[in-house]
């Protein structure tokens, strides 16, 4: 039930392990920090990371007459979270489902969750272009979707998969809002590229979509995993916070 949701943003990645869920989580927290009511929907069925990243593992969801009720992280209900991880007894339990069952579950997540009034719903997807993504795109035809953000590291292998994501979005009619790159930053001021540099910038220029910023992987940000603390609150002067502010400003301007 997305009738109370004003804006829907999908977060994609061509490969796993590039920081997509971290970007989704911190983007949701940054939007909340900016005064918006936000929902975060984790549909990465085989690798749900959002409950761990927000310290919500072990939370129990329940169903009411109107559908599933998401987990709220605060009494003011400024951040609502839904994930397949809440349905698993153990974080290490695998989800061994065939395509049709995955499709059914994602449709339920997109249509049967009782979201309250939300300014933004961030959808964290699995990596790649699979049945899950096709299901999301089909459901988005029935609900206004603002577009997709693609998360990548700048090495050529990851960028090749990003090109596939871009083609997928174009074929399914999803607007591309921009690319976010992930680097490694061993200290506060000097960013070290362990891959090739400027790959995302050059690709964004080539396909004519915005390059939203480069998020350095700051060890201090990793410490925030397991809590609902935003980088903007805890590390307001960090390079990561500066990039997140820019992304939020870009999204708010578009919506």
UniProtKB/Swiss-Prot annotation:
UniProt signal peptide: none
Highest rank taxon of the organism: Eukaryota
Main localization category: cytoplasm
| Keywords noted in UniProt | 4Fe-4S, ATP-binding, Cytoplasm, Iron, Iron-sulfur, Metal-binding, Nucleotide-binding
Asked if the Swiss-Prot or TrEMBL record annotates the protein with the keyword Nucleotide-binding, the reply is yes
Cystine connections: none
> What Gene Ontology molecular-function terms does this entry list?
4 iron, 4 sulfur cluster binding; ATP binding; ATP-dependent FeS chaperone activity; metal ion binding
Q: Write down a Pfam family by its short name.
A: ParA
For this chain's UniProt record, which GO biological process terms are given? Answer: iron-sulfur cluster assembly
A single GO cellular-component term from the record reads:
cytosol
User: Where is the protein found, in the record's own terms?
Assistant: Cytoplasm
Q: Which cofactor does it need?
A: [4Fe-4S] cluster
PROSITE patterns, A to Z: MRP
Task: Name the positions where ATP binds.
Answer: 14-21
Record-annotated residues binding [4Fe-4S] cluster?
185, 188
Q: How is the cofactor bound?
A: Binds 4 [4Fe-4S] clusters per heterotetramer. Contains two stable clusters in the N-termini of Nubp1 and two labile, bridging clusters between subunits of the Nubp1-Nubp2 heterotetramer.
Keyword Amino-acid biosynthesis carried by entry: no
Functionally, this protein is described as follows: Component of the cytosolic iron-sulfur (Fe/S) protein assembly (CIA) machinery. Required for maturation of extramitochondrial Fe-S proteins. The Nubp1-Nubp2 heterotetramer forms a Fe-S scaffold complex, mediating the de novo assembly of an Fe-S cluster and its transfer to target apoproteins.
Q: Which family does it belong to?
A: Belongs to the Mrp/NBP35 ATP-binding proteins family. NUBP2/CFD1 subfamily.
The record's note on quaternary structure and interaction partners says: Heterotetramer of 2 Nubp1 and 2 Nubp2 chains.
Q: What is this protein called?
A: Cytosolic Fe-S cluster assembly factor Nubp2 homolog
What's the source species for this entry? Drosophila persimilis (Fruit fly)
Upper lineage ranks?
Eukaryota, Metazoa, Ecdysozoa, Arthropoda, Hexapoda
Its gene name is: Nubp2
């Amino acid at each position: 039930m997305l009738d109370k949701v004003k804006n829907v943003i999908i977060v994609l990645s061509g490969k796993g392990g590039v920081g997509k869920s971290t970007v989704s989580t911190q983007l949701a927290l940054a939007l909340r920090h900016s005064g918006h009511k936000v929902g975060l929907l984790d549909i990465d069925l085989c690798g749900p990371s959002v409950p761990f990243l927000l310290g919500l593992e072990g939370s129990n969801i329940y169903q009411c007459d109107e559908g599933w009720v998401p987990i709220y992280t605060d009494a003011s209900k400024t951040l609502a979270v839904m994930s397949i991880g809440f349905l698993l007894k153990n974080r290490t339990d695998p989800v061994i489902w065939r395509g049709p069952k995955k499709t059914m579950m994602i449709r339920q997540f997109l249509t049967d969750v009782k979201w309250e009034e939300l300014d933004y719903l961030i959808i964290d997807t699995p990596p790649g272009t699979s049945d899950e993504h096709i299901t999301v795109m089909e459901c988005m035809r029935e609900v206004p979707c603002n577009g997709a953000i693609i998360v990548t590291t700048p090495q050529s292998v990851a960028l090749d998969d990003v090109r596939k994501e871009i083609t997928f979005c174009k074929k399914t009619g999803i607007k591309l809002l921009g690319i976010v790159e992930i680097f490694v930053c061993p200290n506060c001021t000097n960013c070290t590229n362990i891959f090739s540099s400027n790959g995302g910038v050059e690709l964004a220029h080539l396909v004519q979509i915005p390059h939203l910023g480069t998020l350095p992987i700051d060890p201090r940000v990793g410490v925030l995993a397991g809590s609902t603390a935003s980088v903007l609150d805890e590390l307001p002067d960090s390079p990561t916070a500066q990039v997140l502010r820019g992304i939020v400003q870009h999204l708010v301007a578009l919506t």
